[in-house]
């Protein structure tokens, strides 16, 4: 992502568009996620992959379900993705909370910091800052 794209001078980056597409694919309307969150997600993905996203689509597809679950909540996520996907993402979130320093944990904390986490998710998983 180049510097000018971050500030909208050249429009939104291809990576942000790919993340938007991945979020749409799991039922999360991109407008529900602030651009600052999207840019941070992309930076977290890059950091996890050594500074470069080798496969942008695969990386975004890995992040999108966690973002969608945190923002939409269990019911809406399940409506869009089915019960098996819901159980899988809930297991990922439980694991992330137990581990504490995983990429999934960072995605969940990011939605919490941005105040876009669905309240029932906060309550169910006892998410809190600090």
How would you describe each model-predicted region?
Residues 2-4, 14, 67, 72:
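N-terminal functional modules and adjacent low-complexity/disordered segments of proteins
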Residues 3-11, 129:
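Short, aromatic- and cysteine-enriched interfacial helices/patches
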Residues 8-57:
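Short terminal alpha-helical segments
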Residues 28-34, 49-57, 75-81, 97-107:
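Charged, low-complexity interaction regions
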Residues 58-76:
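Short, hydrophobic/amphipathic alpha-helical patches that form generic packing surfaces
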Residues 62, 81-84:
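Loop-to-transmembrane helix junctions at the membrane interface
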Residues 83-130:
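Amphipathic alpha-helical binding modules
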């Amino acid at each position: 992502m180049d510097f000018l794209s971050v500030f909208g001078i050249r429009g939104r980056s291809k990576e942000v568009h790919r993340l938007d597409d991945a979020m749409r694919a799991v039922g999360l309307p991109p407008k529900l996620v602030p651009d600052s969150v999207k840019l941070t997600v992309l930076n977290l993905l890059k950091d996890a992959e050594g500074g470069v996203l080798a496969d942008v689509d695969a990386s975004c597809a890995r992040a999108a379900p966690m973002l969608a679950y945190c923002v939409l909540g269990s019911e809406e996520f399940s409506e869009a993705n089915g019960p098996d996907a819901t159980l899988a993402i809930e297991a990922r979130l439980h694991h992330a909370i137990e581990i504490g320093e995983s990429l999934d944990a960072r995605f969940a904390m990011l939605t919490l910091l941005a105040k876009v986490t669905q309240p029932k998710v906060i309550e169910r998983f006892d998410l809190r800052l600090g």
